[in-house]
Amino acid sequence: PAFMIGAIRSLLTIAPAFILHEIAHKIMAKRYGCWAEFRADPSGLRFGVIFSAITGWVFMAPGAVMVLGRTTVSQFGRIALAGPVTNIVLWSIGAIAVLAGYVTGLESNITNALLETWIWGNGVLALFNMIPLGPLDGKKIKTWSDTVFWIWLTIAAGTVYANIKILGPILGPMT
């Protein structure tokens, strides 16, 4: 039962974080006249399912949006930035909901559990994708602009810091 509850919780919180992150890439790519399509990676999905079953933590790389077309370095960087920015916006919505629930007293165990996974999922996804290595967004953003990269890396790291120091204590111990 605990695994099923965790799976449902992740489906409601982590799946939107990932899906909207990828849709943001596609929307920006289309804006620049590029072809963009999600490509599944079964090995990343298998790894994620096994990792989650063993550790209880959700970490999946089920695929990514592939972009084809003529873009400038700036456009490609902006396409990459759309994903982490989306996660930071989603994290902000969750953070506001946590604070609103705390201030008004309209919080519940179920809501807190969902918000906890929401803020952690979006914060970590934004920060992870800002790593400037391999196929991750951070590398494309840094290639485009060091300044933009460092600003958004700092913001993404700030979401995780806020989860630990501010929002985590409000929500209570991880469930």
Question: What do the predicted segments below correspond to?
Answer:
Residues 1-175:
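Hydrophobic transmembrane alpha-helices and their immediate loop junctions
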